Amino acid sequence: MNTVDKEKFNLKTRGRLSAWLTKHNFSHRPLGYDYRGVEILEVKSEEWLSTAVALYAYGFNYLRSQCAYDATPGGSLVSVYHLTQMQDQSDQPEEICVKVFVSRTNPQIPSVYWVWKSAEFQERESYDMLGIIYQGHPYLRRILMPESWIGWPLRKDYVVPNFYELQDAY
């Protein structure tokens, strides 16, 4: 089972789901709430798959969206998951946002395709634009850029090819 990093734990930002994860010894760090009051958590890459399965078992049966971004030039890449508890006749389903930070030198995160099938195209887009490798994804390949494209266009350190170089390539 995972361990809780108690030194980085801020009780002021800890929500109900963070308390549940702590009770069940899942490693995470609360990051507060967004403008709608949705709890935001940080989970380490190596802990993400087991935490994702636990969240699914807890009732977060819908991956509303997955996206990724480059936090800072030369810094971490972040994969963001917005999860929702979909229940019958639920006017305001519970939501959570989970962020997984990875190094740009080894950007590997376990795929949650086997937990939420809707992750298929979303993880592929994050791979295509930022180069995050989703381990265990059955179809991980470029989805927007040509297979021959070099580099990851949404990284802040990406150097845009000269237009004429691209034109001459065809």
Curated annotation (Swiss-Prot):
TM segment ranges: none
GO cellular component: chloroplast thylakoid membrane
EC number: 7.1.1.-
Main subcellular location of this protein, as a coarse class: plastid
GO BP terms, alphabetized: photosynthesis, light reaction
Top-level taxonomic group: Eukaryota
Protein name: NAD(P)H-quinone oxidoreductase subunit J, chloroplastic
Originating species: Adiantum capillus-veneris (Maidenhair fern)
Record lineage: Eukaryota, Viridiplantae, Streptophyta, Embryophyta, Tracheophyta
